[in-house]
Amino acid sequence: MNSFRGAFLIWAVATWAETDTSWGATDEPGFQNCKNALKLPVLPVLPGGGWDNLRNVDTGRVMELAYSHCRTTEDGQYIVPDEIFTIPQKQSNLEMNSKILESWVNYQSSTSNSINMELSLFSKVNGKFSLEFQRIKTLQVKDQAVTTQVQVRNLVYTVKINPDAELSLGFKKALMDISEQLENNQTRMATYLAELLVLNYGTHVITSVDAGAALIQEDHIRSSFLQDSQSSRSAVTASAGITFLNIVNFKFEENYTSQNTFTKSYLSNRTNSRVQSFGGLPFYPGITLQAWQQGVSNHLVAMDRAGLPLYFFINPERLPDLPGPLVRKLSKTVEAAVRRYYAVNTYPGCTDLSSPNFNFQANTDDGSCEGKMTNFSFGGVYQECTQFSGNEVVQLCQNLEQKNPLTGSVSCPSGYSPVQLLTQTHEEGYNHLECSRKCTLYIFCKTVCEDVFRVARAEFRAFWCAASGQVSENSGLLFGGLFSGKSINPLTNAQSCPAGYFQLKLFENLKVCASLDYELGYRFSIPFGGFFSCAAGNPLVDSATSKDLGAPSLRKCPGGFSQHLALISDGCQVSYCVKAGLFTGGSLPPVRLPPYTRPPLMSQVATNTVLVTNHETASSWIKDPQTHQWRLGEPLELRRAMRVVHGDGEGLSGGAAAGLTLGVTIALAGVVALAIYGARKSRKKGYQALQDEKQSLAAGAAVNGDALDQEQAQNPA
C-alpha cells in the first residue's frame, strides 16, 4: 500500500512539473523563443496580411503565421514563420533609373505596383486614393506640370507565403459571424458585416513581397519646359539624374557645358521637389549612396507587393467546418461588398486636362471630353410613403412624403414622365408602454405593464420627372444643386441652397435645391442632366431609349454632362448629372469607406438553420445544438433531423402539444383537489367515530355503576 502511495506521489509531481513547463512555454510568443535560441532578428517584411488596393495601405492579418519550427532565410540572416519561404538575391540587385510621367493617368506606385495591376476588379481605380497618387495629380493639375522620377532600388529578398496557410483566428471569426447571419436568412445584417470585413481587412490579400529599400527623388517641372525640349527628352531625364546625384553626394565628372546649362534651366523650371527614403538609413542632405546602401540589410521594407482578392481565400478547403453551399454563398457576399467599395469610389468623367469638360475629381474616363451639352428641363421630384407599423405612436411619413411643387401632389406635370429612383424601407425605434392581463388558473388575474422597444417601419418611393418630349420653355424647375447630412452643396460650399431656392426632400436626408423664379434664380441655376441609381438608369442619356418605355435606361450621364454622387442610401449609390466642368474645383475627394448598408434596428426572429444539403455531392451537414458547429451527418442523424424539419405521424403539432399540456394540468389539479377533499372527509369521520365510542363507553360505565349500587344495597356489611 505504501509503495502504491509513493508511486502515485511521484506521478503527481511529474505531471505538475510537465504542466508547469508547458505553461511557461506558451506564455512567450513563438518568435521570441526563436530569437532567444538563434540570436537572430525576425524578418520584418511578411506577406499574408490584408491590403486596401484603393488606398495602398496594409490592413488586418488574414493568414495565420507561427514560429514553431524556428526556420530562417536561406542565407541564415533572419527568422521567418513556418508558412513563409524566401528567395534571396544571390547578387547585389541595385537598380537606378530616371523617367518622365507626363500624366497622372499613367501613375504607378513606387511600392505596390504589382498588386495595383491586378485585373480581377476595377483596376483603373487601384491606388487612386493613395497619398502618393493624390499628391502627384494635384501638383500636375494645379501647377500645369509633369513629373520626373529618379530612383535607386536595392532588392534583397522575395518573400512568399505557402498557398496552404490557414486563416487567422480573427478573420475566421468574422467569416463565421457572416455565415451565421446567412444561414438564418438575415441578409441585411450579413451584408453589413461583410462591408465591415472589407473595412478591417481590405480588398486583397498579399501573397508575395519584395523586401529591400529605395531612394526616390520626385520633381515637378512646368509642362511648357518639356514641350519646348521635345528634341531633348533624354536631356530632361539626364538633368533629373544629375540633380539627384548631387543630392546624395555622388561625385561625377561634368563633361559637357551644354548639359550644365540645361540642368540649370531644368532647376529654374522646377515647381516642386522631394526625396523619399523607403528603408535603409533615413535620408538627410549630403548622405552618400554608399552609406545609404550599407544600411539596407538592417532596415528592410516592402518594395513591391503582389496578391489576390480577399474573397479568393474564402473556400471550402480553408473553412472545412462549414457546409460547401454556405461557404460559396459567404464568398459571394464578401465579393459583392468588395465590388461595392470599388463602385462607390469610382468617379467617371473627362480626364483630359486640355478639354473644357475636364473633371478634376474623375479617376476614370467616361468619354465625356468630346460631348456637347443639351439643355434638358427639370420637372421636379416627389416622394411617396406608406407606413406599415408604429403609426399609432410614430408618424414616419410626415418627414418622408414630398409633393412636387409643379403639381402640388405626388405626380409629374404634363409632358414629363416619372422615373422611380429607389424603393426602400425606413425604420425608427421607439419605446412604448404595453399592458396585458395575466391570470393564474383563470382565477387570479392582474394587469402587467412593460416598457417595450418596438420598430416603426415605412416604405418610401423616390421619383424625379424627366421630359418625355418637347416641353415649353421655362416650364420646369431651376436646379440649384443638392446636399445631405454628410455632404455640402458644391454651389454654395455649405449645407444650404442658393438665394431664392427652396429645398425638396428626397430619400431620408437628401435636399434638392429648386426654384420657380426664372428672373432672380437663373444666375444660380445649373444645367441639369438627370438622376440615376443602382436600381434605375437615366432616360436622358438617349432620346430613343427614353421614348421606348420597355427599354432599360443606361446608368450614366448624357454627353457634355458629368456625374456626381448625391448620396449612398442604405448601400445604393444615387448620382446626378450636371454640366461637365462644374463642381470640379477644390481638392480631390477622400475615399468613401464602408459600411454603406444600415444594420437592422431589431433583427427579426431568425430561423435556426440545422440542416444544409448539397445536391451536387449528395452530402448533408447538421448543426450541433450544443456546440453550434457544423459536421457531416450520419444516416441516422439525417433521418432524425428530417423528422424534426418536416414532421411525421409520430409527433404532435404545437397546438396538440399545448392542448395536451393544458389537459394534463387540469387533470392533475382535479386529482389534487379530490385528494384534499378525501383527506378532510376521512378526518371528520374519524372524529365522529371517536365521539360515538366515548359516548358508548360513558353509558356502559353508568350502567355498571347502577348495578354495583344495587348489589351493595342488597348485601349490607
Curated annotation (Swiss-Prot):
GO BP of this protein: adaptive immune response; antibacterial innate immune response; antigen processing and presentation of exogenous peptide antigen; antigen processing and presentation of exogenous peptide antigen via MHC class I; defense response to bacterium; defense response to Gram-negative bacterium; defense response to Gram-positive bacterium; dendritic cell antigen processing and presentation
GO cellular component: cytoplasmic vesicle; phagocytic vesicle; phagocytic vesicle membrane; phagolysosome membrane
Cysteine disulfide partners in this protein: 34-70, 350-369, 385-397, 435-449, 439-445, 534-572, 557-577
Coiled coil: none
GO molecular-function terms, A-Z: wide pore channel activity
Residue span of region P2: 413-656
Family matches, as Pfam families: MACPF
Compartments (UniProt record): Cytoplasmic vesicle membrane
PTM annotation, UniProt: Proteolytically processed in two steps to generate the Macrophage-expressed gene 1 protein, processed form: cleaved by trypsin in proximity of the helical transmembrane domain releases the ectodomain into the lysosomal lumen to orient the pore-forming domain toward the endogenous membranes, and processed by the asparagine endopeptidase (LGMN). Proteolytic processing in antigen-containing vesicles is pH-dependent.
Site feature Cleavage, where: 352-353, 357-360, 631-632
Positions of the MACPF domain: 30-345
PROSITE patterns the UniProt entry points to: MACPF_2
Broad class of where this protein is predominantly found: membrane
Transmembrane annotation, as ranges: 113-120, 127-132, 235-244, 248-256, 656-676
Family in the record: Belongs to the MPEG1 family.
Assembly: Homooligomer; predominantly forms a homooligomeric arc-shaped pore complex instead of complete rings of 16 subunits.
Notes concerning its domains: The MACPF domain includes the central machinery of pore formation: acidification causes a significant structural rearrangement, leading to oligomerization and deployment of the transmembrane beta-strands (named TMH1 and TMH2) that enter the membrane as amphipathic beta-hairpins. The P2 region contains beta-hairpins to interact with target membranes.
Function according to Swiss-Prot or TrEMBL: Pore-forming protein involved in both innate and adaptive immunity. Plays a central role in antigen cross-presentation in dendritic cells by forming a pore in antigen-containing compartments, thereby promoting delivery of antigens for cross-presentation. Also involved in innate immune response following bacterial infection; shows antibacterial activity against a wide spectrum of Gram-positive, Gram-negative and acid-fast bacteria.
Protein name: Macrophage-expressed gene 1 protein
Taxonomic lineage of the native organism: Eukaryota, Metazoa, Chordata, Craniata, Vertebrata
